[in-house]
Amino acid sequence: MVYAFNWKKLSISAALGYRWDGKRCRLWFQTQPGSYNDERLIAFVRDLKKHLRGQAAILIWDGLPAHKSRKMKQYLESQRSWLEVETLPGYSPDLNPVEDLWSNIKGQELANRCVAGLGEAEDGVCSGMDRVRQSMLPFSFLHHAGLFF
């Protein structure tokens, strides 16, 4: 069997947004071919700002090199009026609710699949994101990370 698909060609960025009172959770995501770099992540944060409609937010993310670049740091500094950024300790995926999101989708929509191309892989990801959005799973991801209300 010849299998030419390479997972490194599809990247996904996601944000889980929790209200301070625990009444609502929102999920935003973006897929793209290739890898994320600081420019693409800045565009994702800009899109996130539009969705939040001026509401203040705390962004908690891991140590991906693009999160720590000089360009990203300068951009985040310019967004301090609405965005506070906290970085998770190194090697701590158990503290990141988005890691549980990835695990859930990989274990459901992407499990045991031999996709023919990026479009099919992206369809599986989008289907999984829709399923998670319509459930209470994001709250379980938060609880698993020890960050429950």
Protein language model features and the residues they cover:
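RNase H-like polynucleotidyl transferase catalytic core
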Residues: 1-3, 77-100, 113-114
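Acidic/histidine-rich, metal-coordinating catalytic segments
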Residues: 45, 55-67, 96
